From Swiss-Prot:
Originating organism: Daboia siamensis
BPTI/Kunitz inhibitor domain sequence ranges: 1-11
Any GO CC annotation of this UniProt entry: extracellular region
Protein name stated in the entry: Kunitz-type serine protease inhibitor C10
Keywords: Disulfide bond, Protease inhibitor, Secreted, Serine protease inhibitor
Family the entry assigns: Belongs to the venom Kunitz-type family.
């Protein structure tokens, strides 16, 4: 999980 790629991942 990369916080720089702001996608809806559910983390």
């Amino acid at each position: 999980y990369n916080p720089a790629s702001n996608q809806c991942q559910g983390f």
